[in-house]
Each structure stands twice: as C-alpha cells, then as structure tokens.
Amino acid sequence: MSFSQKYFQENEFAIRDKKLKYYLSPTLLENNFKHGFFTKTSSEINLLLLSNRLKLNNKNCVLNQIHSNQIVFGSKTEEKQREEADGIVCDKQNQNLWIYTADCMPILFADKRKRLVAAIHCGRKGLENKIIKKLIKIFVIKDAQKKICLSQ
C-alpha cells in the first residue's frame, strides 16, 4: 500500500461511486480546487464519461507521457492530440489536468492566490532530469507560491 493510499484511508478521504473510486487531498479541498486521485479501475473509464460523472467541463488536458522533464501548458493539449511531456500547467480557468502513474509519482503544485495548478508524472528519468526544479522555475516566473499538495 502506498503512502498516499494509507494516508487517505486513515483520514477517510476515499470516495466510492459504484466502479469509480478516488481520493481527495485535504490541502486541495481547503483551497477549493476540484481534484481526484483515481485507482486503476477508474482509469478504464472513458475520460469524457469520467468528466461528465464528476460534473467537470470537457476541457481535458492529457499528455502522451514519455518519462522526460518536458512541461507544457494546458492550452497546448487536447484529448485527441496529446503533447509529449510529463508535466502540465493550467494556463486557463476550468482546465482538467490528467496525469497517469503506475510506479512513478504524481506530484501536484497549486497556488490559491494565482489559481495556478500544475501536475507532473515524475519517474526516475524525469527526476534525474530535474522536472520538479523546472516546474518550480515556471511557478517563480508566474509569481506563484510553490506548495506541493501530494506526492505518493
């Protein structure tokens, strides 16, 4: 059992909705960010159906994750034409960021004041190539505060 699964179980942040099971971060909830960390079973559900079920718009920002240190802005991504990268930064309101992980770490950054959110798929190669440092630099340029919300 991963640290985040154990943490969420102990703090009762697991949500179950028939086939859909996901976890919520207390930090993101306190700051009114819509979010969810989904299980493998949930990933089998079509992204548009998942967005509708969670009452999200259909502005899904999805990546073709390549185990790199590449970071893109959400407006460059579309579900049908995925950018090759492992990090994504919201640059418009109401964008849905989607990151998939197995043995890599999902890491979220958020700034309540700027309403800026970023997600990275952090594996060994991305970590070695300083993807986290690269994302922090983007937050500094955007005058955002850096706060890691969750890492597995």
What annotation goes with each model-predicted range?
Residues 1-152:
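Active-site microenvironment for binding and transforming phosphate-containing groups
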